[in-house]
Amino acid sequence: MRQYLDLCQRIVDQGVWVENERTGKRCLTVINADLTYDVGNNQFPLVTTRKSFWKAAVAELLGYIRGYDNAADFRQLGTKTWDANANLNQAWLNNPYRKGEDDMGRVYGVQGRAWAKPDGGHIDQLKKIVDDLSRGVDDRGEILNFYNPGEFHMGCLRPCMYSHHFSLLGDTLYLNSTQRSCDVPLGLNFNMVQVYVFLALMAQITGKKPGLAYHKIVNAHIYQDQLELMRDVQLKREPFPAPQFHINPKIKTLQDLETWVTLDDFDVTGYQFHDPIQYPFSV
């Protein structure tokens, strides 16, 4: 939690104002931030200086794992995080590849589970990684990549956290996640949870011990309309100790995650938090 607040303070103190063309807003921006989460010792990086709705972050990750491309499917899992980008993004609404209401296009999990091949077939990146790790194999290329420039025009949003690289040392599993852009007050709250949970889940379904998850952010920013709340409210609060995250031990396989797993299979204990803060969201 302290490393999150340190990054927020760094942006406030050292950030440079950048005009963001997509949103039409100014962002206070720094380049490069590295966060580390101790999954093996269950140090869950849930923000405590405001109430964090961790279930929505886990639901979104489940949707990515399942390769969902429709905001309605994400809502059914328990998150509305894709409603705006699917239905309120004017550029996407005018895009001929949009199939209709709630369609997200070929983003995130679609690329992870069905990356298009030139011959017309598809590559299931995630299944390959799970199969390898389950056999104790690390070919130094256990990489889940959502970043496909050849299909950006076929989706409502380029991926922000676009790469997850899994590594084995003995029977301990590690994760390096890379994020090109991060709305720190809003998005990082979710992204930290997802990096942690992704490693915890992958370790469980491959029979490995979770180690550390490394989270690199390239462009970390605070939007101008978020700055006052961050500087004058959230950064004035003292963090509480880290809570703990729990996964249903009956989850054993990738197929389990694809079929019957719901938010009821996850729990957080020891979570103390300050009052919620309503940060503006930029579509």
UniProtKB/Swiss-Prot annotation:
Active site: C160 (nucleophile)
Alphabetized UniProt keyword annotations: Cytoplasm, Methyltransferase, Nucleotide biosynthesis, Transferase
Species assigned in the record: Vibrio cholerae serotype O1 (strain ATCC 39315 / El Tor Inaba N16961)
Ranges that cross the membrane: none
Record-level Gene Ontology MF annotations: thymidylate synthase activity
Protein name: Thymidylate synthase
E.C. number(s) listed in UniProt: 2.1.1.45
Family: Belongs to the thymidylate synthase family. Bacterial-type ThyA subfamily.
Effect of G187W: In inactive enzyme
UniProt-annotated location(s): Cytoplasm
EC category: transferase
